[in-house]
UniProtKB/Swiss-Prot annotation:
Alphabetical keyword list: Oxidoreductase, Tricarboxylic acid cycle
Subunit-level organization: KG oxidoreductase (KOR) is composed of KorA and KorB subunits.
Source lineage: Bacteria, Bacillati, Actinomycetota, Actinomycetes, Mycobacteriales
Gene name tied to this protein: korA
InterPro entries the UniProt entry points to: 2-oxoacid/accept_OxRdtase_asu (IPR022367), PFOR_II (IPR033412), Pyruvate:ferred/Flavod_OxRd (IPR050722), Pyrv/ketoisovalerate_OxRed_cat (IPR019752), Pyrv_Fd/Flavodoxin_OxRdtase_N (IPR002880), Pyrv_flavodox_OxRed_cen (IPR002869), THDP-binding (IPR029061), Transketo_C/PFOR_II (IPR009014)
Name under which the protein is recorded: 2-oxoglutarate oxidoreductase subunit KorA
Organism superkingdom: Bacteria
Enzyme class of the recorded protein, top EC level: oxidoreductase
Task performed by this protein: Component of KG oxidoreductase (KOR) that catalyzes the CoA-dependent oxidative decarboxylation of 2-oxoglutarate (alpha-ketoglutarate, KG) to succinyl-CoA. Methyl viologen can act as electron acceptor in vitro; the physiologic electron acceptor is unknown. Is involved in the alternative TCA pathway that functions concurrently with fatty acid beta-oxidation.
Amino acid sequence: MDPNGSGAGPESHDAAFHAAPDRQRLENVVIRFAGDSGDGMQLTGDRFTSEAALFGNDLATQPNYPAEIRAPAGTLPGVSSFQIQIADYDILTAGDRPDVLVAMNPAALKANIGDLPLGGMVIVNSDEFTKRNLTKVGYVTNPLESGELSDYVVHTVAMTTLTLGAVEAIGASKKDGQRAKNMFALGLLSWMYGRELEHSEAFIREKFARKPEIAEANVLALKAGWNYGETTEAFGTTYEIPPATLPPGEYRQISGNTALAYGIVVAGQLAGLPVVLGSYPITPASDILHELSKHKNFNVVTFQAEDEIGGICAALGAAYGGALGVTSTSGPGISLKSEALGLGVMTELPLLVIDVQRGGPSTGLPTKTEQADLLQALYGRNGESPVAVLAPRSPADCFETALEAVRIAVSYHTPVILLSDGAIANGSEPWRIPDVNALPPIKHTFAKPGEPFQPYARDRETLARQFAIPGTPGLEHRIGGLEAANGSGDISYEPTNHDLMVRLRQAKIDGIHVPDLEVDDPTGDAELLLIGWGSSYGPIGEACRRARRRGTKVAHAHLRYLNPFPANLGEVLRRYPKVVAPELNLGQLAQVLRGKYLVDVQSVTKVKGVSFLADEIGRFIRAALAGRLAELEQDKTLVARLSAATAGAGANG
C-alpha cells in the first residue's frame, strides 16, 4: 500500500506559500521511525502507538533495539527503530515493510532504506546529513542530493534546526533542544495522520514533571512539528485512517511483557495466593520484573536476585511456603535454572518459569528474537523431568496464557514453562480489558490439620500430590531432591518405587486437561496445513489471508499447549496431505511432531533474529504446494556452507 497515492516522485521542497493539503483515506499504513539509540525512537513510536490506540485503530508494533548499550553515535550498529501498522480493520502483524520511513540520520536511512518499497515515503532530518556522518556509514555522496533516492518520495526536513528555533524562546540549552527533535518528528507525523496532540502533551508534562523546562522544550518541539506540517507546502497530502470495528469492550495498548505481568497478578488474585517473583534482570525479560514491582498492593513481592540460580531458588522456596512462585528469564538463564527446575519437578511444587526467548546460543543476540528454546524447555534437564510448556501467540494473548499457566501449575502442582519471545515481549497491540470478576477462580487445596495427610498421596483425577504449608501443626513432612517413596515421601532408592514415581510424574503432565486444537480452514478441504507456535501466529495468519484472496486453499493451526499437546493434534495433522511448520529455529517443533505422530511435517526455518514476514510465508505456501519446499531449505544450508569464511581467506573468504 502506497500512502502517497502517486508512486515515485522527486524530492520535495518548502514553498513560499501554503495551500490546504489534500486528504486521502487509507485502510492502513506502516510507519517506521529510525535513528540513533539516543534519539528517542522507541518513545516516539510508543507515543504514536498510544495516539492510534486512543483513536480506535487496530495496531501492531515491532521495536528493534541495537544490542549495544550505546554504540558510537551515527553508526549502523547503533540504529534503533520502531515499526507500527495502524488500520481500520483487524490486523495480525506490524507489517512486512514500511510505507513511510522517518530517518533521523544517515545511519538510519542506510540501515532501513532497503525495506522500503519503491514509491514509499522517506522523511529525513537533513541537519544530520553532514559529511562526517555520511562518511561514518559509507556514503561517498549525500543520498539526498545524488539522485539515488529518486525511486522514493523524499521529504527533507531540518528537524534539529527547527526544534532549536522552537525552544529558543524559553532559553533551552542546545543539548536539550537537540534531544527534543524526536518530538518534532512525532508532531509532524501526528499532523499528517490527523492525530491530536493533547494526550502526547499530557504524557510529556507528566513524564518530565520534575524537570518542567525539559517538559516545555519537548512540548514546544511537538507543536513545532505539527505547525510545520500545517504551514509548509512540502506535504501535499494528509491521510485519514478511520477507527477499526473491533468487538465491543474497553481497550488499551499493551506489550507482551506487561500483559504477562498483569496475568500473573490476576492469577494470584484468582488463586487467593501471594505472588513471589524471584528474578535476575536479563534482556528481553526485565520488564516483567519492573512491572510486577509496581503491584505490591495486590500481594505481589518481587526479589531481584544476585543471579539466575538465586532467582529460581527463591521462587521455588516461595512455592514451598504456599505462595505462587514465579521466575522470569531468557534463554541463557533457562540453562542456568535447569537444575533448580529439576528440583521443582521432583518436589512437585507449583512454579511458573517465563522464558522470553532471544537469539542464541550463549549471549547470542540479546535484543533480537528467536524460538530456539523449545527443545530446551521440553527436555533440558537431567533424568525424566517433565514439565508443562505453553506459548502465547501475541502480546495481548500473554495475559490469557499466563492465567492458564498458573492454573496448570497450581492445579497439578508442577512447574510450568511459558515460552514468550522478543517479538511478543516488546511488541504491542490493543487488548480488551477483561472483567476480572467474570474470570473463573483458580482452584487449589491445602491439607488441613486433622485430615489424613501424606506428602505424596495424590488426587485421583489430576495426580497432584497433597500439599501442606510448612509449619502447619500435625502436618510436618519433608520433601527434597532425592527420590521419594510413593505416599509417605520418605527417601527411597528402591527400583520399583523409582519406576513408579517417574511414571506418575509423567502421567500427571500427560493428563493435564487442554482444549482441542482449533483449525482455521474456511473451506474445510485445504491441501496444506501451516502449524505454528508463538509469535509466528501473525505472519502465518496474514499469509493465509492473502493466499485465500488469491484462491489458494490453506489451513492454519496454532499451538498454545506444547506439552502436553492437544488430544486431537494427531488427527489434525493426518487430515491434511501436506503439513508445514514455520519456526524461528532449525525445525524443533517439526522434529517433535514427526517423532510423536509419524507425520511428514516439513520445516520452514529462519534464524536471523527477526520475525517472519507474511510475504516470506506466502512464498513458502506456494513452494509447498508446488513440491519445492525441501529444495528451499536445502539451499539455505548450501548457501551457508559456500559463504563460510575459510582459513587464510579472511572474513569474506
